[in-house]
Amino acid sequence: MRPERVSDEATGSPAPDDTDPVNPFDPLDPFAPVTLPWTTPSPPAVPTAPTAPTAPAASDDGRGRIEGFASASAVAPGDSIDFHVTVDPPRPFRVTVHRIGHYDGRGAAEIVTSPRLDGTAQLPPLTAGRTVSCHHWWLSWRLPVPSYWSAGAYVAVLATEDGRHQAHVPFTVRDDRASDLLLVLPDLTWQAYNPYPAADGRAGASLAPADDEHEAADPVTTVTFDRPYAGDGLPPQAGHAYDVIRWAERYGYDLGYATAGDLHAGRVAPARHRGLVFPGRDEYWTDEMRTAVEDARERGTSLVFLAARTLYRRIEPAPAPSGSDRLLTCGRRRGRPGPALWRENDRAEQQLLGIQYAGPVPRPRPLIVRNAGHWLWEATGAHEGDALDGLVAGGADRYYPRTPLPAHDERILLAHSPYGDRQGARRHQETSLYRAPSGAWVFASGTLAWSPALDRPGHADPRIQRATANLFDRICKRD
């Protein structure tokens, strides 16, 4: 069946409704908030009067309580990472560091706890235009990362000694060894979407164009890593990456870890890995990131993009008083509000991914299987035309016939899923796989629901788990 035409077909430019598909702080988002072991309240050990268990209250950007940020998004074993924390009113606190992983279904493991620390109320954030920075906050605790620590995604939990309030600071421990798969955590996109100091996700210092009442008059063009993440300190989009990590570690894949910032700065060598995995929403890319990934593909490294809206916006890091690449600047679109797009600079994302962003999906819709005889769908139980409920959600990609494709020896679309946009127009999602002349596989899921289908309670789908295993096994050359 011929895909329906849309008004932007000729240029491959964004869908007319180009606002953010999900408000990161919207409780209706089916993939938020991130749930981790220490955020789930436990019932009392000794029976008492029937009262509801309570977890520590999260930080509130309007009143402070406790919140903080780290001096780096990623560190190598043997380096150290600094935490800058404010506690208002001042009280003692501790920092407990957890590593994300399967850990027999627990989802994380406690690694180390700081000594008792004296909390202080730091000075208010500084502002320059609408850029908000806390780079002037005093050092609260320095963590030397031992050389024996495993690479991975870590979360530092800041908790007041009285147990009433807590917040989070995510960071990554990378290593230099070659691995089958290198997971690239999207720290640039997390920070671009960070609306701190807004507590409700609206009108904050974020590069995201949606839900910003000041957008037209005074757009944000620069944000900084020198500030906490809004709300409880954990980027809502981080859950997508954590889903992939828990699932992949459970099944024993040989994983390395890095961040988008590492990729930008050249701190990792992509071609040393069989595949690069981009596990979650990874919208904001630098020129250096794209060049590194394209070069890796040309050298035979496979690419796995597990979320829609990848490589959509173009961003440029810059130095700050606190260090290199601590600022993120995004130019504005030509003649329209919002950050600059790759496809408006003659480098549409489809030229790397094989598909590109089509628009938001207002309500979850089924993913419709196509080419079910392909090896990706082998042993999944999926048949031609099967509907995988809820697997097209948040946002969707598709193939644009008039936008150039990357060079390929093989190419196939593995899903074609209709949905309606916010105006009621018919749209469709597609899942893409192609093989580059170098032999590298390039997979793009085309949906924001793929990663949660791997390990998220209430969203896990064994067919997607098996399909992803087929892909990873092919890349890792497992029999």
Predicted regions, residues:
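Proline/serine/threonine-rich low-complexity linkers at boundaries of modular beta-sandwich domains
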Residues: 4, 12, 23-44, 56-65
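Structural motif
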Residues: 155, 182, 274-279, 304, ...
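Extracellular low-complexity, Gly/Ser/Thr-rich intrinsically disordered linkers
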Residues: 250, 406-479
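Helical hinge/lid and interdomain linker segments adjacent to catalytic or ligand-binding clefts
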Residues: 120-135, 140-144, 148-150, 233-319, ...
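An acidic, glycine-rich "communication" segment
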Residues: 311-424
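Aromatic-Pro/Gly-enriched surface loop or interdomain linker
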Residues: 90-102, 108-115, 163-269
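Ligand-binding face of N-terminal immunoglobulin V-set domains in extracellular IgSF glycoproteins
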Residues: 67-92, 96-103, 108-171
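Active-site rim elements
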Residues: 232-235, 337-342, 348, 451-461
